[in-house]
Amino acid sequence: MIPVTSKSSSGFALPDLSTDRAHRAVPAEGAARAALEGRRTGIAALLPFVGPAVIASIGYMDPGNFATNIQAGAAYGYRLLWVVLAANAIAMLFQAMSAKLGIVTGRNLAELCREHFPAPIVWGMWIASEIAAMATDLAEFLGGALAFALLCHLPLFAGMIATALATCAILALEKRGFRPLEAAIAALVGVIGACYLGELMIAPQDWHAAAFHLVVPQIPDRAALTIAVGIIGATIMPHTLYLHSGLTQDRIAPRDDTERRRLMRFSNREVVVALGLAGFVNLAMVMMAASAFHASAPGMADIGDAYHTLIPVLGPAAGVLFLVALLTSGVSSSVVGTMAGQVVMQGFMRRRLSVWMRRAVTIAPAFAVVACGCDVTRAMVASQVVLSFVLPMPMIALLILSARNDVMGRYAMRMPLRIVAGTATVVIVGLNAYLVWAAFN
């Protein structure tokens, strides 16, 4: 049944169900149990389990994506759309693997790494994950702050304060249980999707060219490869692989293999829908940038400049939609990043920082960037490249653990999926290695 303790294994504080809120949780638990028993079908069966993939999908629409996708569309038009599509497909596979790992084992990825890997590897993964968390929050926090500043005509520092307050307000919903927090994040996901649907309707598109470059791989030059690696780093997020496996634990527990298989099917469907929306948003970002900037400003690389250029090219509505999407993305992804950081520390170190302490630690680099006068967009793009280097660690760990019979039992990954997931991991590691070689040559 739904956990009733004050702390879940994934490290989140859950509401005290001894209060009268327990009575309000019963219908949701009953609906979930009915779905697992096969007494509910269709959308009604899926709804009680919606949440983990929706939260994880925010990581695929964070401000780092805005920065890299604007560069991709402005510099290369539609020619890197296939990278976005491929990265999204890989993300679906690995998020489904992460959710399955949590459902089958009852533990999150970080906990399993601690249990099954040597201590030096565990320490290395934890340190790399914390660096990735700071790099992630750098992009998320700066993106939200920049949007606040431009939308409300505030100094950037004031935008940072406003973003911090908005993030804390959403995190405070966790005290009421995971459902209110999930509902708030789902609403923000809907806002981002609606904004970019509006952008596509405003910006004229060459749909034939977009369809062609969606399926025909092209890397025009070395700079395009760097952006492609950044797209992968911005699209497939290390922290969401840890987080998703943890989020599956705070829900109703299957009582037998039949219910477990149903739960995994529901999880896979949610992954496809939630990350399908994230993929649409990322494709729309590149297409909007291609339409607005490729012909007139191919060197566009600054989010602030992109906003100011959008208004004369596509009209004020396009500029407002862009900022609302960026603001929503920055605030929501910052919340999710904090949640993921809790899972990582609890899993690897068996320790928990308070949410507010973790929030303070991870936003410190963002304040440092502004204080030093660094270019905000360049810092955001650099953070995505950092993420692409950290990414292979949780991917390899997830691949190894998902294939082990002593961890997954009868649910261990079968050979065809091992080959696909292994190939994707090798490609990403190879791209990162090439990027390092190119940087020094």
UniProtKB/Swiss-Prot annotation:
Domain of life of the native organism: Bacteria
Chief subcellular location: membrane
GO biological process, one term: iron ion transmembrane transport
Compartments reported by the entry: Cell inner membrane
Transmembrane segments: 41-61, 74-94, 116-136, 141-161, 183-203, 223-243, 271-291, 311-331, 360-380, 381-401, 419-439
Membrane topology annotation: Multi-pass membrane protein
Keyword Signal in record: no
Keywords of the record: Cell inner membrane, Cell membrane, Ion transport, Membrane, Symport, Transmembrane, Transmembrane helix, Transport
Record GO terms (molecular function): cadmium ion transmembrane transporter activity; manganese ion transmembrane transporter activity; metal ion binding; symporter activity
InterPro entries cross-referenced by the UniProt entry: NRAMP_fam
Gene Ontology CC terms, in alphabetical order: plasma membrane
Family according to the record: Belongs to the NRAMP family.
Function description: H(+)-stimulated, divalent metal cation uptake system.
Protein name: Divalent metal cation transporter MntH
